[in-house]
Swiss-Prot record:
This is Elongation factor G. Catalyzes the GTP-dependent ribosomal translocation step during translation elongation. During this step, the ribosome changes from the pre-translocational (PRE) to the post-translocational (POST) state as the newly formed A-site-bound peptidyl-tRNA and P-site-bound deacylated tRNA move to the P and E sites, respectively. Catalyzes the coordinated movement of the two tRNA molecules, the mRNA and conformational changes in the ribosome. PROSITE patterns: G_TR_1 (PS00301), G_TR_2 (PS51722). Residues 8-283 form the tr-type G domain.
Length: 690
């Protein structure tokens, strides 16, 4: 079956925002107006089409990014819904990785909020072209112009209004399209499906002219001919203006800002037009790079004639179809029934069912092309971030990087049957979400779940209980401490066990020193003259690595350490890889003692937004949690407090903050860095764990 839509007519985009900015409602309206959804789902009634997991429906927040295909003005839109809660930033990163463009939704009353900054920075990291939609213009306190200023002050970006609101709060009627210089007004009776172009109201004409001039000046800067014509008094026509704005979006020169109220069905159709006019198609963004089997860099262009390459960006367990792997096809054509290779894991796979997903229903397809986002059922080996490709032309596309989890809880199944269900469920959850890790505590035998925050783990436990029907006891959350040495240590160690028969003998000399923060563990062998034969070096490494997971301070993983093997001795008969493993283990433990190992604790970047009346209490409380206040500024009439606080002192903070501020203050936190724990904290932790 030949391609229906040219690749130039694709728009793969996501909608990113702070929690509660109206992202899901905006997506819902897009699906409604593009004819994919027959009933509008309201988030506050828990029925939105995109929010399809039971946990999301209950909490009213979007957790998993579902991919949806819709059509507008002959263009094919693939929409990735991204979560807005800080515990799910991994999902946001993952969807930004496979998008070509994004719509950043702001709450016009709040402007740029903490999580908006986080997702914006992630967008910068992946260089995602963006347009901005100032939503909730009907809300009390909505201020479009404050949003523009916020984008400058808080994101350091250049906003350019391409629309202006007509009225605000209860009087929000529609908008002025500055590109066409027309007013667009919505008919309330038709659920916003009907709107009409009219002349710009007299009282707003001057303002419209002023902002149109600003828009044109920003646009013509990108084109010498247009600039010369403009300086001669010739304004660019509509087509030229759109071309220049599109160029600005693709280069990140400025960000067009639109306005509307998704909930009141105003401004959604012009937003869709802007997606088509200004966001890139797969051929407008740089071609994806990868590594071939010889380690050379190769490029895969967005073209059906290129060798097949696709990236798995999301894995979900579907009750009807089984495991579904969402993939972005970067190049080539994918047909069901063909064999592909998972180059990341060097495993072969056969493509079975191929599905086009609409938020909650699916359409079987036989063929998909470059630029498509498809769901594949029944892949056995694929994990998030894996590359699937043509076996004749293997390539590994850029890897996704996932942050280390900072919080953990123990989970104990109540019965043997639960134990079996838990094993299956955890394997599936870990495959779906790389920021969620599962391990077993060697000493206690407990299963440990690790994640990015309390909410992240709460949701996982909820899924275990609801979806997989696992009955289990959950322990209190624990902090993921680390250990590192603080000074260089030199050790010589001999392991000797020679009492008749084949004995054991190995001697090693190490220099162990702190590595750069974040550099991790590094092993270097500087042995000369065969004092430790080559075949025993893996034994040496194995011995060191067996200690890395459990340091000498309180049994936590050791990080940022460099171990150099400088010398050693061996015996022709009694030496073995095992003997060197035992010697290295003991030598490394001794070095950790000598090198003055210390305990590291995760420090979180906390931002509290509070009415001025409670500022004193909030700061006092953060100080009592060993927080270091980094600074304060005003946002509207609220005070924003930035602080660095140890994670161990942030448990249950949400309830404290609520009661302290009568529910009016909010906070967000994310992992920032590891720092040495004070002596009293270290002693307390040692007493508890060592």
């Amino acid at each position: 079956m030949p391609r229906v839509h040219a690749i130039e007519d694709y728009r793969n985009f996501g909608i990113m925002a702070h929690i509660d900015a109206g992202k899901t409602t905006t997506t819902e309206r897009i699906l409604f107006y593009t004819g994919k959804s027959h009933k509008i789902g309201e988030v506050h009634e828990g029925a939105a089409t995109m929010d399809w997991m039971a946990q999301e429906q209950e909490r009213g927040i979007t957790i998993t990014s579902a991919a949806t295909t819709a059509f507008w003005n002959g263009k094919r839109l693939n929409i990735i819904d991204t979560p807005g809660h800080v515990d799910f930033t991994i999902e946001v990163e993952r969807s930004l990785r496979v998008l070509d463009g994004a719509v950043c939704v702001l709450d016009s009353n709040q402007g740029v909020e903490p999580q908006t900054e986080t997702v914006w920075r992630q967008g910068d990291k992946y260089r995602v072209p963006r347009i901005v939609f100032a939503n909730k213009m009907d809300k009390t306190g909505a201020d479009f112009f404050k949003c523009l200023q916020d984008i400058v002050d808080r994101l350091g970006a250049k906003p350019v209004a391409i629309q202006l609101p007509i009225g605000s709060e209860n009087n929000f009627k529609g908008l002025i399209d500055l590109v066409r210089m027309k007013a667009v007004v919505w008919n309330d009776e038709s659920l916003g499906a009907k709107f009409e172009d009219t002349d710009i109201p007299e009282d707003l004409l001057e303002q419209a002219k002023e902002y149109r001039e600003k828009m044109i000046e920003a646009a013509v800067e990108l084109d010498d001919d247009a600039m010369a014509a403009y300086l001669d008094g010739k304004e660019p026509d509509e087509a030229t203006l759109k071309r220049l704005i599109r160029k600005a979006v693709l280069n990140g020169a400025f960000y067009p800002v639109l306005c509307g109220s998704a909930f009141k069905n105003k401004g959604v159709q012009p937003l869709l037009d802007a997606v088509v006019d200004y966001l890139p198609s797969p051929v407008d963004v740089p071609a994806i790079k990868g590594i071939d089997e010889d380690g050379n860099e190769v490029v895969r262009k967005a073209d059906d004639s290129e060798p097949l390459a696709l990236l798995a960006f999301k894995i979900m367990d579907d009750p009807f179809v089984g495991t579904i792997t969402f993939c972005r096809i970067y190049s080539g054509v994918l047909q069901s029934g063909t064999g592909v290779v998972n180059s990341t894991r060097e495993k072969k796979e056969r493509i079975g069912r191929m599905l086009l997903m609409h938020a909650n229903n699916r359409e079987d397809i036989k063929e998909a092309y470059a630029g498509d986002i498809v769901a594949l059922a029944g892949l056995k080996e694929a994990r998030t971030g894996d590359t699937l490709c043509d076996p004749a032309k293997p390539v590994i596309l850029e890897k996704m990087e996932f942050p280390e989890p900072v919080i953990e809880i123990a989970i104990e199944p109540k019965s043997k049957a639960d134990q079996e269900k838990l094993g299956v469920a955890l394997a599936k959850l870990a495959a779906e979400d790389p920021s969620f890790r599962v391990s077993t505590d060697i000493e206690s035998g407990q299963t440990i779940l690790k994640g990015m925050g309390e909410l992240h783990l709460d949701i996982k436990v909820d899924i275990l209980k609801r979806t997989y029907k696992v009955d289990a006891n959950i322990g209190a959350p624990q902090v993921a401490f680390r250990e590192r040495i603080t000074k260089k240590a030199e050790v010589d160690y001999t392991h000797k066990k020679q009492t008749g028969g084949t004995g054991q003998f190995a001697a090693v000399s190490f220099i162990v020193e702190p590595n750069e923060p974040g550099a991790g563990y590094e092993f270097i062998s500087k042995v000369v003259g065969g004092s430790v034969p080559k075949e025993y070096i893996p034994g040496v490494e194995k011995g060191i690595e067996s200690v890395l997971g459990s340091g000498v301070v309180a049994g936590f993983p050791v990080v940022d350490v460099k171990v150099t093997l400088v010398d050693g001795k061996y015996h022709d008969v009694d030496s073995s890889a095992l003997a060197f493993e035992i010697a290295s283990r003991a030598a490394f433990r001794e070095a950790l003692q000598k090198g003055k190992s210390v305990l590291l604790e995760p420090i979180m970047k906390v931002e509290c937004v509070t009415p001025e009346d409670y500022t004193g209490s909030v700061i006092g409380d953060l100080n009592s949690r060993r927080g270091q206040i980094q600074g304060q500024d005003m946002r509207g009439n609220a005070n924003v407090i930035n602080a660095m606080v140890p994670l161990m002192n942030m448990f249950g903070y949400v309830n404290n903050l609520r009661s302290m501020s009568q529910g009016r203050a909010t906070f967000t936190m994310q992992f920032d860095h590891y720092a040495e724990a004070p002596a009293n904290v270290s002693a307390e932790v040692q007493k508890k764990f060592a």
